[in-house]
Amino acid sequence: MNANAQLSRRQFLSLAGGLATVCGLGLVGCGGSGASAATTAAASTDAATDDSANITQLTVGFDQAYPPYGFVGDDGQFTGFDLDLAAEVCSRNSWDIQLEPIDWDAKDTLLSSGAITCIWNGFTMEGREDDYTFSEPYMLNGQVVVVKKDSGIASLADLAGKAVITQTDSAALEVLQGDKADLAATFASLETIGDYNTAFMQLESGAVDAVACDLSISQYQLAAKPDAYTQLDEALSSEHYAVGFKKGSQQLADKVTETLKAMDADGFVKDLCDKYASYGISYDNWLLK
């Protein structure tokens, strides 16, 4: 794999530590003790009525074109690192599993309606904490930029005047519309598309100059075509993956976290990371140790 395909663990932890500090700062309300008591009472009521872990089936919503976390294998079956994790969690809790490929734009509607139980597919939690109940984060990730090796693009600054593409409603898009909006303003265009497989087809054809994507997606593509692509050394951001549930489903989120920790303790997770190592998955980035 090209050396540019990897960010150092130290760089990730440094970036992630900054994010954790920012995300850990809360806003102190100006209301009196009555408002505080009401909030506490409401939270207690929600906790008392939460029976989300009382399930017999976990319906996992995922993007089927998001390797290595969820994709269609050579045998035509759904596979991927996250789907294997989910299957093992279900097995250990005697739950049936239903894998439900979804339109990523429709994920919130499907979750709120109960059509899916969770979103488990390289799902970034930063910036979404108020919209979902999350498991504890289980994997460190980052947003990066991939270009063609012969493009002459060597830094983020070199993207000025270039056409950049990313997935609709993705973490990369959120970064480029938020913290990195000034950078995006220098692009000739910032395009969005439904899946990353098509984005990389456009990069290969020359229709766009760069793809902004998850580190894991980058590593997967570079492993598949090491002579075609390279990853810029500068990362757009660092982030964490977690399993997203409907708001209020804390018991279920906690149960999944508890099971993932047990899977790490008995070596299952390490073996699974090794299985997907050629796809860019590294046990070094696993967080629930």
Regions found by a protein language model. Give the residues of each.
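Bilobed "Venus flytrap"/periplasmic-binding protein-like clamshell domains
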Residues: 64-67, 78-91, 123, 144-197, ...
